[in-house]
């Protein structure tokens, strides 16, 4: 690939990321169905970290400061990023919006490289990335439902799919475990 086609690809990926993140540039933050719960999770992790607790399993800001074990029922690992932003002085809204932008970036790149690998075509990688990242269901999860766990999990679906495809289409059975790394990372 030439430098020009790499620049075109980078530009197209940037447009996809911008379109997926456009609602973040509005003057207000849309309140999704589950958003208050997840904002409290971010603040709970921040409070636990500021008290020197890691990993934060019982978040101290819940239940009138008695704490609640949301970290036992929900995977919190990706929410440590906005919690660290909170510790650096970001508002909870800014930390969450930055988190969503980073998830949109990661979803776009993971889906692009997965579709590119699967079809051996940069163009199909771009189309697949656009269709996946901007799909109605994913955007609904991000901005209407605020289903953090679901849209974070969706980020890894193309990676799981390409890894399983590689395992199932291998001609030689030796070294299958190397191909199993991609879907394992996605899970």
Q: How should these model regions be labeled?
A:
Residues 1-24:
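Start-transfer (signal-anchor) and selected internal transmembrane alpha helices
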Residues 2, 176-187:
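Short, intrinsically disordered, charge-balanced linker/junction segments flanking boundaries
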Residues 2-4, 116-120, 169-175:
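Membrane-interface helix-boundary motifs at transmembrane edges
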Residues 5-9, 93-99, 160, 179:
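Membrane-interface helix-boundary signature
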Residues 10-14, 98, 126-130, 180-184:
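Hydrophobic alpha-helical transmembrane segments
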Residues 20-118, 123-156, 163:
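Active-site lumenal/periplasmic loops and adjacent helix-entry segments of GT-C-fold
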Residues 160-179:
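Membrane-interface transmembrane helices that cradle and orient dolichyl/undecaprenyl
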């Amino acid at each position: 690939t030439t430098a020009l086609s790499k620049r075109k690809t980078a530009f197209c990926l940037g447009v996809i990321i911008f379109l997926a993140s456009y609602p973040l540039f509005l003057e207000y933050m849309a309140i999704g169905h589950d958003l208050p719960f997840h904002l409290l999770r971010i603040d709970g992790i921040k409070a636990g970290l500021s008290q020197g607790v890691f990993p934060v399993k019982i978040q101290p800001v819940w239940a009138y400061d008695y704490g609640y074990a949301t970290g036992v029922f929900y995977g919190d690992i990706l929410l440590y990023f906005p919690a660290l932003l909170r510790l650096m002085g970001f508002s909870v809204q800014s930390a969450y919006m930055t988190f969503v932008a980073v998830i949109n970036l990661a979803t776009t790149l993971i889906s692009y490289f997965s579709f590119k690998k699967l079809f051996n075509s940069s163009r199909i990688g771009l189309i697949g990335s656009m269709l996946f990242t901007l799909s109605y269901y994913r955007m609904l999860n991000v901005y209407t439902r605020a289903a953090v766990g679901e849209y974070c999990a969706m980020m890894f679906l193309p990676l799981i799919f390409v890894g399983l495809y590689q395992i199932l289409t291998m001609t030689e059975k030796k070294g299958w475990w190397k191909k199993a790394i991609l879907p394992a990372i996605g899970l």
